[in-house]
């Protein structure tokens, strides 16, 4: 079911998607609905919001997108919805926290896409560099989905080989190159927006992956935006960290043994998000 403030657009999108059902390998009904139809939904994916402009920080979108969410959530909650929220609207960590606080839902049922896409971008770039299938590059992007995100390189591996060992065995590979990859990940969205005005496919695939983990009860480890309650020494904030995702939403948070500098970078990212939230 699709809901949009522009009902005609939602109807057109539903029609377009329905025309491809024959190629999907399954049966489904796609239609434009109303907020009252949310009552029996298992999952609501929130993507509404103003588009990010060229060189605009995700955090600059906050006040405008909060107003949009307040209106949407009022209607959704009136329907009696009691499933899982998946938030993709930027700035996603703060928007997810807004959904959590307005809805009153338990934190495991309110999830943000977090740094799932950033992690996929990182693994793609590492796969290219080392000529390895990205699915075998086990590295994460943590923190805010934005400028303060970081890679805990001490935890990065190819299969079970630490990335530092792999880099040492690769001619011409230096830690500085890894830092350049990290910066490339951080700037990726800005470059895409500059080229084509918005990001569509990567985040769409990230949302599909998280949804699959939920409906398939997969217990998959994904870097989603989750509510910290003492993990990593932080509390009361949503931020992108590795989590086990299953049918209940976030089954648990995975605490990685971060190094001293990595802990500080996570703390700084949390502090930045908290300060921004308090400015609302």
Regions found by a protein language model. Give the residues of each.
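Redox-cofactor binding/interface segments in oxidoreductases and associated redox assembly factors
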Residues: 44-46, 87
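Conserved N-terminal Rossmann-fold NAD(P) cofactor-binding segment
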Residues: 3-41, 56, 274-279
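Rossmann-like NAD(P)(H) cofactor-binding subdomain of soluble oxidoreductases
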Residues: 58-123
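Conserved NAD(P)H cofactor-binding loop of Rossmann-fold oxidoreductase domains
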Residues: 48-50
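C-terminal substrate-binding/catalytic lobe of Rossmann-fold NAD(P)-dependent dehydrogenases
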Residues: 103-109, 118-280
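Short acidic, glycine/proline-rich loop/turn micro-motifs
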Residues: 55-59, 255-256
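Short, well-ordered amphipathic alpha-helical segments that serve as non-catalytic structural scaffolds
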Residues: 13, 44, 69-72
């Amino acid at each position: 079911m699709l809901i949009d403030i522009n009902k005609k657009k939602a109807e057109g999108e539903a029609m377009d998607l329905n025309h491809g059902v024959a190629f999907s390998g399954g049966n489904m009904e796609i239609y434009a609905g109303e907020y009252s139809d949310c009552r029996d939904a298992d999952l609501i994916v929130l993507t509404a919001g103003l588009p990010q402009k060229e060189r605009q920080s995700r955090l600059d979108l906050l006040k405008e997108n909060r107003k949009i969410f307040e209106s949407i959530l009022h209607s959704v909650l009136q329907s009696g919805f009691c499933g899982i929220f998946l938030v993709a609207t930027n700035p996603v960590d703060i928007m997810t926290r807004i959904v959590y606080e307005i809805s009153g839902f338990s934190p495991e049922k309110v999830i943000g896409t977090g740094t799932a896409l950033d992690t996929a971008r990182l693994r793609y770039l590492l796969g290219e560099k080392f000529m390895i299938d990205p699915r075998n590059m086990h590295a994460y992007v943590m923190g805010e989905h934005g400028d303060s995100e970081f890679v805990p390189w001490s935890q990065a591996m190819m299969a079970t080989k630490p990335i530092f060992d792999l880099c040492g065995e690769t001619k011409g590979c230096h830690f500085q190159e890894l830092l350049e990859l990290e910066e490339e990940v951080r700037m990726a969205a800005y470059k895409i927006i500059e080229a084509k005005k918005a990001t569509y496919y990567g985040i769409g695939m990230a949302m599909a992956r998280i949804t699959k983990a939920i409906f398939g009860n997969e217990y998959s480890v994904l870097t989603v935006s989750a509510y910290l309650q003492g993990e990593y020494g932080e509390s009361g904030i949503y931020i992108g960290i590795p989590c086990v995702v299953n049918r209940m939403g976030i089954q648990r948070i995975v605490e990685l043994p971060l190094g001293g500098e990595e802990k500080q970078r996570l703390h700084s990212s949390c502090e930045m998000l908290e300060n921004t939230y308090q400015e609302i």
